[in-house]
Amino acid sequence: MSSLPTSDGFNHPARSSGQSPDVGNPMSLARSVSASVCPIKPSDSDRIEPKAVKALKASAEFQLNSEKKEHLSLQDLSDHASSADHAPTDQSPAMPMQNSSEEITVAGNLEKSAERSTQGLKFHLHTRQEASLSVTSTRMHEPQMFLGEKDWHPENQNLSQVSDPQQHEEPGNEQYEVAQQKASHDQEYLCNIGDLELPEERQQNQHKIVDLEATMKGNGLPQNVDPPSAKKSIPSSECSGCSNSETFMEIDTAQQSLVTLLNSTGRQNANVKNIGALDLTLDNPLMEVETSKCNPSSEILNDSISTQDLQPPETNVEIPGTNKEYGHYSSPSLCGSCQPSVESAEESCPSITAALKELHELLVVSSKPASENTSEEVICQSETIAEGQTSIKDLSERWTQNEHLTQNEQCPQVSFHQAISVSVETEKLTGTSSDTGREAVENVNFRSLGDGLSTDKEGVPKSRESINKNRSVTVTSAKTSNQLHCTLGVEISPKLLAGEEDALNQTSEQTKSLSSNFILVKDLGQGIQNSVTDRPETRENVCPDASRPLLEYEPPTSHPSSSPAILPPLIFPATDIDRILRAGFTLQEALGALHRVGGNADLALLVLLAKNIVVPT
């Protein structure tokens, strides 16, 4: 159906007589109103008025051109316009426009109404764009802006008669009767929703309904009424230019006037919430909202709204289907190309236990090649939350660089014919009463020990000089820690003897935050050395053997430190050592455990037994 834009901002479909589906039923009047709304942004408030004035000027020019074309039939139209004397008082008699002064008056009135309408539109959109855009308030402004000016109704009526000379006007008394019937029907409908309105608002709305009916008749809104006694139709809609084709609000109403539609839909539908907070993408700019509401008379109210660019291009319009008045009727359903969808993205993260298992498996697999490539290597793995770890390949390369120096500069008292690989895995033990933790030596595997240890103190100065010059122990850790104890041999730092329990408890707490540390300890050829690796900036706990010099160590990002400190050997009773040996442990393990616990044989034996406990992961 073709529609022609008019100067009042509405597009009225041109219908011929007899086209209405509700012939002979004045209560079932059907009319279609199309509103053209300009896309308004907060920064474009100064552009509203020029666009509206331009559109209405083009409208006036189009009407004047139509008047000139139909100038020959003005005399015939004046005869038909004489029947409008019986119309209500707000409809003036139709007078044909024949001179240029009346044309100027029409243009002036149109511009005046355009200014008023743009002011109202500007005020409304600026007050509603940040909070909630109410459908009711939006529609309430439209009849007031476009239909409230009574001074140009006669001109519009005359222009409509000029634009379509072949259609005749319905007698005024029938129009008045229809208006009275619709006014009474609207009053009854307003009584249904009167609990939300004040009596003053009802009276005002009733007057607006009557004025709207008369105004729509004067403006030429198509009301196809074909009673049995009259076979005439209302003049068709007037023609006016509309420069904006971006946004259309099409409102198809049945059995309701425009103001009644505003009141009913404004209370049946909740306001459009958070217009400025949501996103309306330009890819899907159109959204149709079809509301099917039923009043107590089972009358259908179809509201099809197609909106585009009412807000800035990054707003998403969401209309909740809240039905306050008629909860048992159908709620508005959202349809079209811009139906909003709620997407809930739930991020699933693996549990800490699963992550630790994976990390432990990776560390075990990656530590196997390194233990075979080195002649004397100690790998201490702290099974805790770990991310930053040093590659074992790099550790092996560091070891091989110093390996030939070790073999060439061994002391004559000690000789290793075969490589010794010590793999120490430190874990946190939470179920032991001594709180020693699994950072104690768990697995000590000696492949082959040659001649053993030498306790000859005469060779100590010579070996220490050569060691300090040419060799260093590479202790590589991914993250520095205060105390990570790897007991690998006979001697332990006497610092642990003073506060053994405090040190072990601190170690248990600190290993929780350690990353997987790979510590590569290079034996200097004097026997199995003991090392307690700490942060080099804070403290240095160096653990040599009973008669051996200290070990030099370097973190992965620093040079080998050269601050030796010789610790005196500790002597333990032979009975305690024999007791531990009879339990199935080696001499080195017995001496290391005794040094660790300060000579307490019972506690040393308990530590050695606890390291064999396997905690399921």
Curated annotation (Swiss-Prot):
Entry keyword Transcription regulation: yes
GO molecular function: sodium channel inhibitor activity
Bias (Polar residues) ranges: 1-22, 89-103, 155-165
Region of interest (Involved in post-transcriptional down-regulation of SLC5A1), residue spans: 410-412
Compositionally biased intervals (Basic and acidic residues): 43-52, 66-83
Annotated segments matching region Disordered: 1-106, 155-181, 217-237
Domain UBA per the UniProt entry, residue ranges: 571-611
Subcellular compartments: Cell membrane; Nucleus; Golgi apparatus, trans-Golgi network
InterPro entries on file: UBA (IPR015940)
Domain of life: Eukaryota
Sorted UniProt keywords: Cell membrane, Golgi apparatus, Membrane, Nucleus, Transcription, Transcription regulation
Gene Ontology, cellular component aspect: cell junction; Golgi apparatus; nucleoplasm; plasma membrane
Tissues and organs where the protein is expressed, per its UniProt entry: Expressed in small intestine, kidney and brain.
GO BP annotations, alphabetical order: negative regulation of D-glucose transmembrane transport; negative regulation of Golgi to plasma membrane protein transport; negative regulation of nucleoside transport; negative regulation of protein localization to plasma membrane; negative regulation of transport
Function noted in UniProt: Mediates transcriptional and post-transcriptional regulation of SLC5A1. Inhibits a dynamin and PKC-dependent exocytotic pathway of SLC5A1. Also involved in transcriptional regulation of SLC22A2. Exhibits glucose-dependent, short-term inhibition of SLC5A1 and SLC22A2 by inhibiting the release of vesicles from the trans-Golgi network.
Domain free text: The tripeptides QCP and QSP mediate post-transcriptional down-regulation of SLC5A1 at the trans-Golgi network. They inhibit a monosaccharide-dependent exocytotic pathway of SLC5A1.
PANTHER family in UniProt: DNA DAMAGE INDUCIBLE 1 HOMOLOG 2, SODIUM-GLUCOSE COTRANSPORTER REGULATORY PROTEIN -RELATED
Quaternary structure annotation from Swiss-Prot or TrEMBL: Interacts with YRDC.
Name this polypeptide is given: Regulatory solute carrier protein family 1 member 1
Organism: Homo sapiens
